[in-house]
A protein has these predicted regions:
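Beta-strand/loop-dominated core regions that host nucleotide or nucleotide-derived cofactor-binding catalytic loops
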Residues: 2-5, 9-91
Length: 91
């Protein structure tokens, strides 16, 4: 799968930060929690790969939302990061 992120999230990733839902624009493809996904900017430049903390359906529901909104949107709290910095490698 592919996760498209905004410019703010791209800058955060370049500074070694985790990917949060607020920076996600859209997803492409279907994937499960724990799968290796590609992170791209809006121009489809490859930025990083990482292990997703949520499946593609969950990310589609929480994309663009603040971390505090995740629990209300999904009905449970998991993690605040879409991909934690420790589970990501920059390309």
């Amino acid at each position: 799968g592919i996760i498209f992120i905004d410019d703010g999230a791209a800058k955060a990733l370049s500074n070694g930060k985790s990917l949060l839902a607020a920076g996600v624009l859209k997803i492409k493809g279907s994937f499960d929690k724990g799968e290796n996904v590609l992170i791209v900017d809006k121009d489809e430049n490859h930025l990083a790969r990482g292990l997703a903390s949520f499946n593609s359906k969950e990310i589609d529901k929480i994309k663009g939302k603040q971390s505090k909104e995740i629990e209300n949107t999904l009905g449970y709290f998991s993690k605040s990061e879409i991909i934690h910095k420790d589970n990501m490698v920059k390309l």
